[in-house]
Design a protein with these regions (language model features):
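Class I SAM-dependent transferase core
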Residues: 1-74, 78, 111-114, 118-125
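Conserved SAM/SAH cofactor-binding pocket of Class I
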Residues: 65-152
Length: 152
């Protein structure tokens, strides 16, 4: 098992996540707010498989954090089909201390966009949310040169 896989296995909750990924208490508080909003919104909007909610730290947050670690110098990240915000919104929260970093989230479902906006505001994540289909976004953003493109 590689180092990133070991980190994900160890990140069973906020404390172990902080230790595994070397993040601040402030970042953990932001992710805890995200987790709370995810639970609340999940009742009315299908954001993740319901069976995965108890493993939000290891299954969703740690998986997303591993991607952030693979591209530490990325300045512009594009997350397609953002849905519940994985990995894009988690990466944006982890990189919130970098004023040169920007995350673009593309999601066609309006309810999911509202969720993404709610989490972004609460967690103070610098993101641009594009409420449209990927094809529409591609037509409108031809000059956007992303360092990383992700989709889950």
């Amino acid at each position: 098992m590689n180092a990133e896989g070991k980190r994900a296995r160890l990140a069973q909750g906020p404390e172990s996540f902080a230790e595994a990924f070397k993040v601040s208490h402030e970042t953990i508080h932001r992710l805890e707010a995200y987790s709370s909003l995810l639970e609340r919104w999940q009742k009315t909007t299908n954001l993740v498989a319901p069976s995965t909610l108890p493993q939000v730290w290891s299954r969703h947050f740690a998986d997303s954090a591993q991607l952030s670690a693979l591209a530490p110098k990325a300045r512009l990240w594009l997350d397609l089909g953002s849905g519940g915000g994985f990995p894009g919104l988690v990466v944006a929260i982890l990189r919130s201390g970098d004023p040169n970093f920007r995350m673009h989230l593309v999601e066609s479902n309006q309810k999911k966009c509202a969720f993404l906006g709610d989490v972004a505001r609460t967690a103070k994540a610098l993101v641009d949310i594009h409420p449209m289909r990927i094809e529409q976004f591609a037509e409108n953003a031809q000059s956007l040169r992303a360092d990383v493109v992700s989709a889950r």
